[in-house]
């Protein structure tokens, strides 16, 4: 059995080998999650051109930490042979490309399973591996998936739809690749038979936008978009402005509505036909007093600082939070207590700061053990790990099929 590459053993996925081929965010985000949970993750990059994410000044140090960097042309014959040899010792392979791009270039699921019948293969693309030919081969990024899925049209303000930001479809799709690959791996361990997963980014976002779509599919009702960050249906829910910034709150519950009505001068409406006893939500449209409730809330909040508002809402057991700015995050006591922001060393020895590993495993925690590797940094070690000699590696490099760091 091939030994794993040198790395600390930690996390719930220690001993699992994951290989991914993909650039930017969606596919690599799946690899990032696996790597932070203890899997040995090998990142395949183009020999001539590194992953375009490397041009960003700081983000790659987060998104590519804990990885092993392999620079290999997997579509040329000798490079393809090395790739297939690597697949023999791989548990999960993730590729992100335009539709069935790998199959078109001869790397089908069946070819991969010839080399490893237990392999879990996750294909991540904008429109899926099959379907209408006018879509399946199209490139897709975050906004494309949001627009095509019905997700984008639900977001923004009543005057204009806006994409959810930053890069929501990429992260949702990457996490879908992570979870579905783990589900498949669990089944493989029971049956010994590999699995192929077809992840279409637009279908991921279709599912993420499902809540109000059901009203249309089953009743023909189109949900309006938010107005200045407020829930399109329920008053007292959403984004509100105070004297010194913004909060969000959710006025939900019998007691909560009764008490907030008293605070803002609407106690006389309680128990009326419009706001009967036991009301748990105030419908912005159906309740005749929905707009009055909103106006009174705006007036009440605008004349108070955030600290006073949050204190009172807490007393009323109304869920609420200040809208934190990025500079406020790392000094927040909850962030400090849970070490939500952390630091690690880059490969050049510099300190990098960013989000910590999530979620927090109690018995087998994740770990940050290395920064982003250089382009081709681990090619030599990976090829030796699967049985290549120094001479064979040099031949691949001389032919432009692999890149190593001397």
Curated annotation (Swiss-Prot):
GO terms for molecular function: L-carnitine CoA-transferase activity. This is L-carnitine CoA-transferase. Pathway: Amine and polyamine metabolism; carnitine metabolism. The gene is caiB. The keyword Ribonucleoprotein does not apply. It catalyses: crotonobetainyl-CoA + (R)-carnitine = crotonobetaine + (R)-carnitinyl-CoA; 4-(trimethylamino)butanoyl-CoA + (R)-carnitine = (R)-carnitinyl-CoA + 4-(trimethylamino)butanoate. CoA binds at residues 98, 105. Its EC number is 2.8.3.21. Keywords: Cytoplasm, Transferase. Signal peptide: none annotated. The active site is at 170 (nucleophile). Catalyzes the reversible transfer of the CoA moiety from gamma-butyrobetainyl-CoA to L-carnitine to generate L-carnitinyl-CoA and gamma-butyrobetaine. Is also able to catalyze the reversible transfer of the CoA moiety from gamma-butyrobetainyl-CoA or L-carnitinyl-CoA to crotonobetaine to generate crotonobetainyl-CoA. PANTHER family: L-CARNITINE COA-TRANSFERASE, SUCCINYL-COA--D-CITRAMALATE COA-TRANSFERASE. Homodimer. It holds the Pfam family CoA_transf_3. GO terms for biological process: carnitine metabolic process. It comes from the Bacteria. GO terms for cellular component: cytoplasm.
């Amino acid at each position: 059995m091939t030994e794993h590459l040198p790395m600390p053993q930690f996390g719930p996925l220690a001993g699992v080998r994951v290989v991914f081929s993909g650039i930017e965010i969606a596919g690599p985000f799946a690899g990032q999650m696996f790597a932070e949970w203890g899997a040995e993750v090998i990142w395949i990059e183009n020999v001539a051109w590194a992953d375009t994410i490397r041009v960003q000044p700081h983000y790659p140090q987060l998104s590519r930490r804990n990885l092993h960097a392999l620079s290999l042309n997997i579509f040329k014959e000798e490079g393809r042979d090395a790739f297939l040899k690597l697949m023999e010792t791989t548990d999960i392979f993730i590729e992100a490309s335009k539709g069935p791009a790998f199959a078109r270039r001869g790397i089908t699921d069946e070819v991969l399973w010839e080399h490893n019948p237990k392999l879990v293969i996750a294909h991540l693309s904008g429109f899926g591996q099959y379907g209408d030919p006018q879509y399946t081969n199209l490139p897709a990024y975050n906004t494309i998936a949001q627009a095509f899925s019905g997700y984008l049209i639900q977001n923004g303000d009543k005057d204009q739809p806006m994409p959810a930001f930053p890069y929501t479809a990429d992260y949702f799709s990457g996490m879908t690749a992570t979870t579905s690959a783990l589900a498949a791996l669990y089944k493989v361990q029971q049956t010994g038979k590999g699995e192929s997963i077809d992840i279409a980014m637009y279908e991921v976002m279709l599912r993420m936008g499902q809540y109000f779509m059901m009203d249309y599919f089953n009743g023909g009702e189109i949900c309006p978009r938010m107005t200045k960050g407020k829930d399109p249906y329920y008053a007292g829910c959403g984004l509100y402005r105070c004297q010194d910034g913004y909060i969000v709150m959710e006025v939900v519950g019998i007691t909560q509505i009764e008490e907030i009505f008293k605070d803002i001068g609407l106690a006389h409406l309680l128990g009326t036909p419009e706001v009967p006893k036991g009301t748990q939500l105030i419908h912005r449209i159906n309740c005749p007093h929905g707009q009055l409730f909103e106006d009174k809330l705006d007036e009440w909040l605008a004349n108070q600082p955030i600290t006073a508002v949050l204190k009172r809402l807490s007393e009323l057991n109304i869920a609420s939070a200040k809208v934190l700015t990025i500079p406020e995050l790392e000094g927040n006591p909850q962030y400090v207590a849970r070490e939500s922001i952390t630091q690690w060393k880059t490969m050049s020895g510099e300190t990098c700061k960013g989000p910590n590993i999530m979620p927090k495993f109690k018995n087998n925690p994740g770990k940050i053990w290395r920064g982003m590797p250089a382009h081709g940094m681990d090619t030599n070690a990976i090829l030796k790990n699967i049985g290549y000699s120094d001479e064979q590696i040099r031949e691949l490099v001389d032919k432009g099929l692999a890149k190593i760091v001397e």
